[in-house]
From Swiss-Prot:
Any one Gene Ontology cellular component term annotated for this protein: cytoplasm
Cofactor: binding details: Binds 1 divalent metal cation per subunit. Can use either Co(2+) or Zn(2+).
Chain sites annotated for binding NAD(+): 71-76, 105-109, 129-130, 142, 151, 169-172
Molecular function (Gene Ontology), one example: metal ion binding
Pfam family, one: DHQS_C
Gene coding for it: aroB
Protein name: 3-dehydroquinate synthase
Residue positions binding Zn(2+): 184, 247, 264
Principal subcellular localisation of the protein: cytoplasm
Organism field: Ralstonia nicotianae (strain ATCC BAA-1114 / GMI1000)
SUPFAM superfamilies to which the protein is assigned, alphabetical: Dehydroquinate synthase-like
SS bonds (residue pairs): none
């Protein structure tokens, strides 16, 4: 087992990475201080892993309740969140009750938001079961739900007590879900570590095949990068914004198509190819770097051609973004491979990227 610590002073917590973690009661024990835990999971994950986690926590002498929600991004709503609150109130959960988020990013985000809100804050543990949630969404304390006009627009910062990333759970992921997680792995290399990006390039075939050792390496590499960024900028007032590389385009794709039509990682993957293209158009990176980002995204079985939402619609959707200020869209771009920054962009270059992205992969798009 590998442990990476998120250094946030009194809110610091460990991220445990390994196999067989779901059954290890000793990993849960330090973080469930009350007498009760509530596992929040979904209809897909519950039959696979809920009994294992429940047994581990019960072995500590704790009372365990379970909330099983429908699966999918389209259920990341107020209505679904209220089902968690209803269950907590019905079970008599108090301020010492620990919530356990067992599932992917949707479950982690909603459980974390419920924990941040219930009785003004209760502890929770992240047990991510998808690659995307293990390398990204379970780390850093961002929680929330979607609004019809924008993704993750309603939420709170609420750090978990611990993260247990069990690599065994990745073996049951459908190929599309695995690919979606690879988008965030690639993102971390692109924005912060060129050597890590090159490692992903060398091992992409094995990663696509879900090789356990390579997956552990990818989770560790990504978590180390994200933990370092979060430790420096917990509330996204500066540096942490670079973790949104590809997300301004990606969130617009998700909202424009309807949440759940594309997986979050698929939209981010396409968004990274678009952001790399825009970085090149503005003269920050050379064509080879742009092509490497797009080629690796494609090699990870992610889309690199954007849906044709229309340029005006795309821009309107991107204005509903947490980075936007006074209606001005901000993008995370690459200054070079492994170094990202936040900036505004000229309208003509943005429109050029949008127009070419829906016609052909950015690697094939002529640059004006």
């Amino acid at each position: 087992m590998i442990t990476v610590d998120v250094d946030l002073g009194e809110r610091a917590y460990p991220i445990h990475i390994g196999t067989g973690l779901l059954s290890q009661a000793e990993l849960f024990a330090p973080h469930i201080r009350g007498t009760r835990a509530v596992i929040v999971t979904n209809e897909t994950v519950a039959p696979l892993y809920a009994a294992r986690v429940e047994a581990a926590i019960r072995s500590l002498g704790k009372t365990v309740d379970m909330v099983v929600l429908p699966d999918g991004e389209s259920f990341k709503t107020w209505e679904t969140l209220n089902r968690i609150f209803d269950a907590l109130l019905a079970s008599g959960a108090d301020r010492k009750t620990t919530l356990v988020a067992l599932g992917g990013g949707v479950i982690g985000d909603m459980t974390g938001f419920a924990a941040a809100s219930y009785m003004r804050g209760v502890p929770f543990i992240q047990v991510p079961t998808t690659l995307l949630s293990q390398v990204d969404s379970s780390v850093g304390g961002k929680t929330g739900i979607n609004h019809p006009l924008g993704k993750n627009m309603i939420g709170a910062f609420h750090q978990p007590q611990a993260v247990l990333a069990d690599i065994d759970t990745l073996r049951t992921l459908p190929p599309r879900e695995l690919a979606a997680g690879m988008a965030e792995v690639i993102k971390h290399g692109a924005i912060a570590d060129a050597d890590y990006f090159a490692w992903i390039e060398r091992h992409i075939a094995g990663l696509n095949a879900c090789d356990a050792d390579l997956m552990a390496g990818a989770v560790r590499g990504s978590v180390q990068i994200k933990a370092a960024v979060v430790a420096q900028d917990e509330r996204e007032s500066g540096l942490r914004a670079i973790l949104n590389f590809g997300h301004t385009f990606g969130h617009a794709i998700e909202a424009g198509l309807g949440y759940g039509e594309w997986l979050h990682g698929e939209a981010v993957g396409c968004g990274m190819a678009m952001a790399a293209d825009l970085s090149h158009r503005l003269g920050f990176i050379d064509i080879d770097t742009r092509n490497r980002v797009t080629a690796l995204t494609r090699a990870a079985n992610l889309p690199v051609v954007a849906p044709d939402l229309g340029v005006a619609r795309f821009i309107d959707l991107m204005r509903v973004d947490k980075k936007a200020e006074a209606g001005e869209i901000k993008f995370v771009l690459l200054r070079k491979l492994g170094q990202a920054f936040v900036t505004t962009v000229p309208d003509t270059d943005l429109r050029a990227t949008l127009q070419h992205a829906v016609l052909r992969p950015p690697t094939e798009a002529p640059v004006a």
